[in-house]
Curated annotation (Swiss-Prot):
PROSITE patterns: RIBOSOMAL_L2. Signal peptide: none annotated. One of the primary rRNA binding proteins. Required for association of the 30S and 50S subunits to form the 70S ribosome, for tRNA binding and peptide bond formation. It has been suggested to have peptidyltransferase activity; this is somewhat controversial. Makes several contacts with the 16S rRNA in the 70S ribosome. Keywords: Ribonucleoprotein, Ribosomal protein, RNA-binding, rRNA-binding. Residues 253-269 have a biased composition (Basic and acidic residues). The keyword Ribosomal protein applies. This is Large ribosomal subunit protein uL2. Disulfide bonds: none annotated. SUPFAM superfamilies: Nucleic acid-binding proteins, Translation proteins SH3-like domain. Belongs to the universal ribosomal protein uL2 family. The keyword Methyltransferase does not apply.
Length: 280
């Protein structure tokens, strides 16, 4: 994916860049695979904010993605189109199965219009094919990996991400995650060969606040500039530093959010490397 830089005709354009969408072959989605998508503004069913800084944004329709592919084993499918999906960073591929059904999948790097893909234990090891981990050779780069057999892909679904199959030990496969964490996964889980496409998406510069508003992101306001009624760090005479350890607007101490002693931690072989550049 190529990135186009704008000429500095305005302050907002000066720092902006945009995808060239060179891989996209069709601009209109498959109507039968669209669903309505209502906005929540970051609120739950009680109206309470559960995700801050969300709201507004362009209207979207959800594209139904097939993250399982286990009910199409042995049925060949042809890639009809590569399409843009506003709901994720990766592009999506429209498959026309030879039995007449149409489905979307995450578009891996190198998958082009007209390519024939397959799923099942006997599928070839080529980009876009979906197989159980026990049938994939060690060292293969994969994406769209399941955590539980038949539950659908959960790992390595965003643009440019991938997982490496390091080995197999009994009923488990050893995987290296995008975070460098090494963990065990049930060998019956399925994965797709290759890495997710659209890897240059991370290099796009949005350039101005307005483009983030189009995406549904609202401004992030620091607690120390709020009033005491709005945030524990608010108030004070003049400019202050907050006067306490960093907390959320609801008083929750800032820091690690990963749940300790989670049942799936038993499957971790080696923790991810710490980010040395991150503030302590």
């Amino acid at each position: 994916m190529a990135i186009r830089k704008y000429k500095p005709t305005t302050p907002g354009r000066r720092a902006s860049s945009v995808s060239m969408f060179s891989e996209i072959t069709r601009s209109t989605p498959e109507k039968s695979l669209l669903r309505p998508l209502s906005k929540t503004g970051g609120r739950n069913s009680h109206g309470h904010i559960t995700t801050r800084h969300r709201g507004g944004g362009h209207k979207r329709r959800y594209r139904v993605i097939d993250f399982r592919r286990n009910d199409k084993d042995g049925v060949l499918a042809k890639v009809a189109h590569i399409e843009y999906d506003p709901n994720r960073t990766a592009n999506i591929a429209l498959l026309h199965y030879f039995d007449g059904e149409k489905r979307y999948i995450i578009a891996p790097k190198g998958l082009t219009q007209g390519t024939v893909v397959e799923s099942g234990a006997n599928a070839d090891i080529k980009v876009g094919n979906n197989l159980p981990l026990r049938n994939i050779p060690t060292g293969t780069t994969i994406h769209n990996v399941e955590l539980k057999p038949g539950a659908g892909a959960k790992l390595a679904r965003s643009a440019g991400s991938s997982v490496q199959l390091l080995g197999k030990e009994g009923p488990y496969a050893i995987l290296r995650m995008p975070s460098t964490e090494i963990r065990r996964v049930d060998i019956r889980c399925r994965a797709t060969v290759g890495e997710v496409g659209n890897a240059d998406q991370i290099n796009i510069r949005w350039g101005k606040a307005g483009r983030m508003r189009w995406k549904g992101w609202r401004p992030t306001v620091r607690g120390v500039v709020m009033n005491p009624v709005d945030h524990p760090h608010g108030g004070g005479e003049g400019k202050t530093s907050g006067g306490r350890h960093p907390v959320s607007p609801w008083g929750q101490k800032e820091g690690r959010t990963r749940r300790p002693k989670r049942y799936s931690d038993d499957m971790i072989v080696r923790r991810r490397r710490a980010n040395k550049n991150k503030k302590r």
